[in-house]
Design a protein with these regions (language model features):
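Short, solvent-exposed mixed-charge patches
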Residues: 193-194
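Tryptophan (W) side chains
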Residues: 172-175, 181
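Juxtamembrane/interface alpha-helical elements of multi-pass membrane proteins
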Residues: 2, 8-79
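Bilayer-spanning, highly hydrophobic alpha-helical transmembrane segments
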Residues: 7-19, 141-172
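Glycine- and small-hydrophobic-enriched helix-loop-helix hairpins
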Residues: 47, 52-122, 129
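A structural signal for alpha-helical segments
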Residues: 25-32, 104, 123, 151
Length: 194
């Protein structure tokens, strides 16, 4: 019975540590995705400037070269462009793909869709440049949030886990198994046993 209690305490501690690490990882993943998006937009800008390839084809190439959620965004947008315009496909892809980007990040990326496929090459390059400047600000914010919150949530998970373990250990192990008290029903209380 005592082994089961120790094992449960261990599982509670591990679960709380993993929960804290998982929350902290979201800040790291957001920063990573913003940097990947900036790189993907640089590739997009270069291909629009020099190759004059159609946007669905460019997005398909970027999707193959990009990893994770950013690659999925470009892949979904490329596939959607077979049925809808580039600006609608881009906007829908950003919202459909489950990424670590927050609402403000997505809003900035959606602004790119306003001129996507609607204007000449110079207009699109200008919109990409504006989007990249806003992304740079978001990247700096993500760096600040990561530095502030990554350690906080990791340590918070450990601290909460230890607190729960201490409280449960006190109740389960100390009070029940080790305290030399015995219920004295005649006096409606407890008596100390030596």
């Amino acid at each position: 019975m005592l082994f089961v209690k120790y094992f449960m305490l261990f599982l509670i501690l591990v679960a709380s540590v993993l929960l804290g690490k998982n929350i902290a990882r979201k800040y790291v993943n957001r920063l990573k995705e913003l940097e990947e998006m900036r790189t993907a937009l640089n590739i997009f800008r270069s291909k629009v400037s020099f190759t004059y390839s159609p946007i669905p084809e460019i997005f398909g190439e970027i999707a193959k070269d990009s990893k994770g959620n950013i690659g999925k965004i470009f892949s979904v947008a490329s596939k959607k462009m077979e049925k809808v315009t580039a600006n609608i496909a881009w906007s829908e892809a950003i919202n459909e793909v489950d990424s670590n980007l927050n609402k403000e990040d997505k809003k900035i990326l959606e602004n790119l869709s306003k001129l996507l496929g609607q204007t000449d090459v110079e207009g699109q390059i200008s919109q990409i440049d504006i989007t990249q400047k806003f992304l740079d600000n978001q990247i700096q914010d993500a760096i600040d949030e990561k530095q502030k919150n990554e350690k906080l949530y990791s340590k918070l998970g450990i601290t909460i886990g230890l607190a729960i373990v201490v409280v449960l250990a006190w109740n389960w192990l100390w009070w029940i198994d080790f305290v030399p008290w015995e219920r004295d029903d005649s006096k409606n209380g407890y008596k100390f046993i030596i």
